[in-house]
Curated annotation (Swiss-Prot):
It comes from Aeromonas salmonicida (strain A449). Belongs to the GroES chaperonin family. Keywords: Chaperone, Cytoplasm. Together with the chaperonin GroEL, plays an essential role in assisting protein folding. The GroEL-GroES system forms a nano-cage that allows encapsulation of the non-native substrate proteins and provides a physical environment optimized to promote and accelerate protein folding. GroES binds to the apical surface of the GroEL ring, thereby capping the opening of the GroEL channel. Its main location: cytoplasm. Heptamer of 7 subunits arranged in a ring. Interacts with the chaperonin GroEL. GO terms for biological process: chaperone cofactor-dependent protein refolding. PANTHER family: 10 KDA HEAT SHOCK PROTEIN (PTHR10772), CO-CHAPERONIN GROES (PTHR10772:SF58). One of its GO terms (molecular function) is protein folding chaperone. GO terms for cellular component: cytoplasm. This is Co-chaperonin GroES. It is found in: Cytoplasm. Transmembrane segments: none annotated.
């Protein structure tokens, strides 16, 4: 299935971090925190400004990002995997290699 976000929305696939404690113990269940890193799968056309102009998004498909998972972040199933739909303002940083 193909999904196309609207306006300033971004579709992200979470990149799961290995859940280990500082001592090397593998954490499971509620002890393991969800990763706030992901890969951008799709982006909208841009943010609509007050004057009607459209400002292109700073992120692009394939970018690795760090995001804030808070109010307004929606989880959906896409082809059997969980993806996140969020506003570009919920993205805190682009991870550059």
């Amino acid at each position: 299935m193909k999904i196309r976000p609207l306006h300033d929305r971004v579709i992200i696939k979470r990149i799961e971090a290995e859940a280990k404690s500082a001592g090397g113990i593998v954490l499971t269940g509620t002890a393991a925190q969800k990763s706030t890193r992901g890969e951008v799968l799709a982006v909208g056309t841009g943010r609509i400004l007050d004057n009607g102009d459209v400002k292109a998004l700073a992120v692009k498909v394939g970018d690795k990002v760090i995001f804030n998972e808070g109010y307004g972040v929606k989880t959906e199933k896409l082809d059997g995997q969980d993806v996140l739909i969020l506003s570009e303002t919920d993205i805190l940083a682009i991870v550059e290699a």
